[in-house]
Amino acid sequence: MGAGAPTATGALALNDGWAELKRMWVVPQARGRGLSKALLVALETRARDAGITWLRLETGIANHEALGLYERSGFVRIGPFGDYRPDPLSVFMEKRLS
């Protein structure tokens, strides 16, 4: 990682009453320091501030680290949402924001 290089990223796609967590990523060299959790908390706060009730996401079945983070953070598995279709390689999750 060079000086000034991005370490982590994430985004929200806002919808009517819900948002989709998009492109959350921490560079491998910075993992294990709590950045993923901090980024997720920041995105949840931003969603709440925008009046969002539900936060949803799609991730791959092989992304075990992300699945663990989301489950520990209160996300539960659901079926496809939005424009997604059933996909055996995808996991769909949501969390109610209070």
Regions found by a protein language model. Give the residues of each.
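Acetyl-CoA-dependent GNAT
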Residues: 1-22, 27-29, 40-42, 46, ...
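Active-site acidic-Proline motif in GNAT/NAT acetyltransferases
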Residues: 27-29, 33, 61
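Short coil/turn segments at alpha/beta junctions that flank glycine-rich nucleotide-binding fingerprints
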Residues: 33, 49-53
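Short, intrinsically disordered/low-complexity patches at protein termini
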Residues: 31, 44, 88-91
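C-terminal "cap" of GNAT-fold acetyltransferases
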Residues: 53-56, 60-73, 79-98
